Amino acid sequence: IEPRLFSFNSPYGYCSACNGLGVENIFSSTPCSVCGGKRLNPNALSIKVGGKNIWEVTDMTIDKALDFFNNLKISKKEEEIANVILKEITNRLQFLIDVGLHYIKLNRKSGTLSGGEAQRIRLASQVGTKLVGALYVLDEPTIGLHQRDNELLVNTLRNLCDIGNTIIIVEHDENTILASDWIVDFGPGAGKNGGDRKSVV
């Protein structure tokens, strides 16, 4: 078994009827009649972990996938082999949840993501690198977030700052603004508003 077996970009893994497109032809949105839109061949789909093949796992939402991997029942030998990989998978899924993306399916096409969702995915990937001394510039990252998810995102941003990074955010959400160390207020009526949180608020 090789990684390319699970890639719809490789002739070893892709469905031979649709060449990994998942549709009848390049101009169609009708799912491939052979793979049903899964884009992979029967060999790739026959391999299962925890009773699920790669397509079934990637068709889960991020929170469901984290639950699946956290509750995966494997043998002692399999655990020795997969321990590092499973830890990496669960950490990355948790980062995505921490930035409010629990509802997104793993197989969602990047072109269907909103600007805010794409921005938070990039942020989650940066959080996972444990990079220090970086400058992040974010444009309204809380747009479209539920208040609970907003708090998770603010905590994630605070953690990034605490390990030695600088974050500049363009934001209108009051809670996010109040969580910052320094505020610069632009726009009509802003006057000389700018400075530490206490002096501005």
Regions found by a protein language model. Give the residues of each.
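Conserved phosphate-binding elements of NTP-dependent enzyme cores
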Residues: 1-201
